[in-house]
Design a protein with these regions (language model features):
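Short, small/polar-rich motifs associated with maturation and membrane association
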Residues: 1-278, 289-291
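Surface-exposed loop/interface segments of Gram-negative outer-membrane beta-barrel transport/assembly proteins
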Residues: 133-221, 258, 262-365, 380-384, ...
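Long hydrophobic segments that form regular secondary structure
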Residues: 373-375
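Beta-sheet entry/capping signal
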Residues: 239, 250, 378-380, 385
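Short glycine-/small-residue-rich flexible loop motifs, especially phosphate/cofactor-binding loops
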Residues: 42-44, 87, 329, 338, ...
């Protein structure tokens, strides 16, 4: 029966019938077909336990999860659960989901008491697969995946329709015509009348040089979201594991490679993650067992960046699109030079490829455990020691791009810069 099931808890392994606190357990079979679990182990927990929420701020594979065991609306819900992998505190996003044997979720104070204040918001215990005794067994699985934006905004890409909506809203609020659409795009009734004329006759060009000031004027129908974003992107992942051994010694070794391309049409965005795990168990004596587990994780991401123009802090693409990507604006001038809108949105930097951010992360985790059976099946003594090393590197470049506001007038944004930062963490 389910009451006879063995559950991993804060005080060791117990039968479910002997546990007083609120505990839930999920096995690898329960989650093996979960969509996205190969991308991030936390995704396999979504919707698996009543009351527990697993959220991501966006769909980037680099994004870590916020796991709230007691739901979003309870007191103290602002804290995320403590995650332990084989007894060692770990970022769940670094774990290879193929190595996971089971999840145990400790919900209430009685079951998390052993963890003190760190377990205030609940504890998730992840147990990884153990070696299988017997002849060597090699397992491989892989997949090729397609990804698509889950939410795509409805875009008004007709320049005249967009301008009419903007003009109506502005006049209703201020009872006067605007002087500018924004800090880049000027507005005048002369330009608006020309927009109506060119929209009525498609044979006209979507640009002209204003004879009074020599500047370009634009009358486009540009869908900037189609310019920036692909309809879908792809990724692939490969897992291999080797296990075997006898009564004295057994082993489990696994490796994983996951790669996903970016969603942008330019900029060479890419994400890669590699995992290696080695676990060995040696029965030195019938009553003495030594176990060692070593994990390596390497993560690399390259992404094009937008910019503020005055610092190296990236702006999100969506914010720059909201500020600068109006359908009346064009991407390039008739001579192929960048428009001001193309530079301000960040598209020029995406295409030229020299404004970017590269992140690298390396984790190494080693745990050695010794178990002594003092009285078989009655009294057990156990001790373990662990070592954790983490290194992160970030390099970022923001370079200048020239735009032309007329055949003989140009500007530049922003000033070029390059910086690097590095951090280490040893425990």
């Amino acid at each position: 029966t389910s009451l006879e099931e063995v559950v991993v808890g804060g005080y060791g392994v117990q039968k479910k019938r002997d546990i007083v606190g609120a505990v839930e357990q999920i096995t690898s079979k329960d989650i093996e077909n979960r969509i996205g679990s190969y991308q991030n182990a936390a995704r396999s927990l979504q919707g698996s336990i009543p009351g527990m929420t697993v959220t991501f701020s966006d769909g980037k594979p680099t994004r870590g999860a916020t796991v709230r065991i007691r739901g979003e609306n309870t007191i103290g819900a602002g804290g995320s659960a403590l995650v332990l992998v084989d007894g060692v505190e770990t970022d769940i996003s670094t774990v290879n989901s193929e190595d996971i044997e089971s999840y145990t979720v400790l919900k209430d104070a009685s079951s998390t008491a052993v963890y003190g204040s760190r377990g205030t918001f609940g504890v998730i215990l992840i147990t990884t697969k153990k070696p299988d005794k017997g002849q060597m067994k090699i397992t491989y699985n892989g997949s090729y995946n397609f990804y698509q934006r889950s939410v795509t905004p409805e875009i008004v890409d007709n320049g005249l329709d967009w301008t009419n909506s903007f003009l109506e809203s502005y006049i209703n609020g201020r009872a006067t015509d605007p002087a500018n659409i924004n800090n880049v795009f000027k507005f005048s009734r002369t330009w608006y009348d020309e927009l109506n004329r060119r929209n009525a006759d498609p044979s006209y060009e979507k640009w002209r040089v204003n004879p009074s000031n020599g500047r370009y004027e634009y009358f486009g129908n540009t869908n900037w979201y189609d310019i920036f974003y692909k309809d879908y992107t792809t990724g692939h992942q490969h897992n291999i594991s080797v296990t075997g051994g006898g009564d004295v010694a057994s082993y489990y070794v696994s490796g994983r490679m996951f790669e996903q391309d970016g969603i942008y049409n330019a900029g060479d965005e890419k994400y890669q993650q590699f995992n290696v795990k080695a676990k060995g168990i040696v029965n030195v004596k019938p009553w003495l067992r030594v176990e060692n587990t070593t994990d390596f994780m390497y993560r690399y991401s390259h992404q094009p960046t937008s910019h503020t123009g005055i610092s190296t802090t990236p702006m999100t693409v969506s914010r720059m699109l909201n500020h600068q990507a109006y359908p009346v604006a064009l991407v390039t001038n008739p001579d192929g030079t960048w428009t001001e809108a193309a530079v301000y949105t960040g598209w020029a930097g995406f295409v030229e490829g020299n404004s970017w951010r590269k992140d690298r992360k390396f984790d190494m985790n080693n745990r050695t455990a010794v178990t002594i059976d003092l009285l078989k099946d009655v009294l057990v003594a156990a001790a373990d020691v662990s070592f954790y090393f983490n290194q992160t590197d970030r390099r970022q470049a923001v370079n200048s791009y020239t735009y032309y506001t007329g055949p003989d007038s140009s500007g530049e944004r922003p000033s070029g810069s390059l910086y690097e930062e590095r951090s280490y963490n040893r425990q």
